[in-house]
Design a protein with these regions (language model features):
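Low-complexity, intrinsically disordered terminal/linker segments enriched in charged
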Residues: 149-172
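A solvent-exposed, acidic/Ser-Thr-rich amphipathic alpha-helical stretch
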Residues: 48-49, 53, 57-114
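Hydrophobic pocket/interface hotspot
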Residues: 39, 50-52, 59, 74, ...
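Exposed beta-sheet edge and beta->alpha loop/turn motif
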Residues: 111-147, 152
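Short, low-complexity N-terminal intrinsically disordered segments enriched in polar/charged residues
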Residues: 17-49, 53, 170-172
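Sec-dependent N-terminal signal peptides
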Residues: 4-14
Length: 172
């Protein structure tokens, strides 16, 4: 019995030492967080050049419907946004839990992955419907070096679908 207890104790210690703990470090003011802040300032100013520079040539863009696109298709989609909307504003929606009001954070994971996430509100005026639109969104960006390699969007795309439909009706 004594040998059994010692064996179980040794096995427990051995296996618990091998337990890998994955974790991440969250930053609210690092370089990548600032770059995403600048990204949305560029969107408000319709500065497509900044986006072309920040996103990797190997970008995989995943839209709210789960469809994947490459960088050229992503840039074409942003240009369409500029064509369909005016007075685009991105506002913090103060979803922070730390009281800072920050809606952008970057997490550096122990696996080596780095993701920046934004929780915000989009507002604009539709050029074809004339509608004032506003909705909350969440976007996650995966980094490879100082380039965004993956963008994943989470929001209801109905506003964009309605504006695109109005645009297509007028062009018939």
């Amino acid at each position: 019995m004594k040998n059994f207890i010692i064996t179980v104790l040794c096995a427990t210690v051995l296996f618990s030492c091998n337990y890998k703990k994955d974790f991440g470090v969250v930053n609210l003011e690092d370089e990548k967080t600032k770059l995403v802040e600048d990204l949305f300032k560029a969107v408000e100013k319709e500065n497509i050049g900044f986006l072309k520079e920040l996103f990797s040539k190997d970008l995989v863009f995943v839209n709210p419907d789960g469809e994947e696109f490459n960088k050229d298709e992503f840039i074409a989609g942003v240009e369409e946004l500029f064509e369909m909307f005016e007075n685009v504003k991105i506002k913090e929606n103060n979803n922070s839990t730390d009281g800072s009001g920050s809606a952008i954070e970057t997490t550096h994971y122990s696996t080596g992955d780095t993701w920046t996430e934004i929780w915000s509100d989009f507002s604009a005026n539709g050029k074809y419907t004339g509608d004032e639109v506003s909705f909350p969104f969440y976007i996650a960006y995966k980094w490879e070096g100082n380039k965004i390699i993956r963008e994943m969007q989470y929001f209801n795309p109905k506003v964009f679908d309605n504006e695109r439909e109005a645009k297509n009706m007028l062009s018939k």
